[in-house]
């Protein structure tokens, strides 16, 4: 009996603690997508013409997080058969990313978008060993040689590709990009900012389900009116 008397306060204290903790767990708050988002003008967050959903990315070729996310983005795009809209957003503190983006634009416009993607992938793979613009040029030169391409002495004599990179960066500033990579899954009607790369597939699944659930626009057959003459 004495033991029971000693145990009773312990049991009561344990039950009290459980009751105190339970409401806290029940009220655990889970943030919603885009909650507390700081994006400003989101008008550009649309898939390309003809696509219902896409991955929209602002990236910096000198950014380690971009290098880690790049293959996952491509795997997701291939898995779901959806396009990637890729924007250059070279950060001010990075010494060679802007020039590398210009080389990527050269390859995209002069060779092919696929070759530009391969170049970006090569730059990300070599990123840790690039400490200067000279290092970046060595990697670029090696890329051209291994792909059987003639490397121009001046890739952008008219400044066209520089303007394209600057236009992308201006779009990022307009959107309010504060870090790279900035990954967003977009449809014609909404977008979700993916702040954790691990949630990319789940986000695509969610938005793709919404897109598939949308009623298809009924095709209206124009009615031909008979032409009468007075």
Regions found by a protein language model. Name each.
Residues 35-53:
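A short beta-strand-turn-helix
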Residues 12-20:
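Bacterial N-terminal signal peptides
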Residues 2-11:
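Bacterial N-terminal signal peptides that target proteins for export
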Residues 27-38, 133-141, 216-229:
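Periplasmic c-type cytochrome electron-transfer domains
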Residues 141-230:
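C-terminal cap of thioredoxin/glutaredoxin-like
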Residues 22-26:
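Sec/Tat signal peptide C-region and signal peptidase I cleavage site
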Residues 51-54, 80, 179-181:
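Envelope-exposed proteins and targeting segments
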Residues 56, 61, 67-145, 175, ...:
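Structural alpha/beta surface segment adjacent to cysteine/selenocysteine redox centers
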């Amino acid at each position: 009996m004495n033991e029971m008397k000693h145990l009773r306060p312990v049991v009561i204290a344990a039950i009290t603690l459980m009751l105190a903790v339970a409401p806290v767990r029940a009220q655990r708050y889970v943030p919603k997508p885009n909650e507390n988002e700081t994006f400003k003008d989101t008008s550009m967050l649309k898939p390309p013409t003809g696509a219902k959903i896409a991955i929209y990315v602002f990236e910096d070729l000198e950014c380690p997080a971009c290098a880690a996310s790049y293959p996952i983005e491509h795997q997701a795009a291939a898995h779901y058969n959806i396009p990637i809209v890729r924007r250059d957003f070279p950060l001010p503190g990075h010494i060679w990313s802007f020039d590398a983006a210009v080389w990527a634009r050269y390859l995209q416009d002069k060779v092919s978008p696929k070759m530009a993607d391969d170049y970006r992938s090569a730059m990300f793979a070599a990123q840790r060993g690039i400490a200067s613009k000279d290092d970046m040029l060595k990697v670029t030169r090696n890329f051209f040689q291994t792909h059987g391409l003639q490397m121009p002495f001046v890739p952008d004599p008219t400044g066209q590709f520089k303007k394209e990179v600057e236009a992308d960066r201006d779009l990022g500033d307009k959107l309010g990009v504060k870090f790279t990579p900035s990954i967003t899954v977009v449809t014609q009607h909404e977008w979700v900012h993916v702040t954790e790369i691990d949630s990319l597939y789940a986000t695509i699944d969610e938005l793709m389900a919404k897109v598939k659930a949308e009623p298809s626009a009924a095709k209206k057959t124009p009615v031909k009116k008979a032409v009468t003459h007075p």
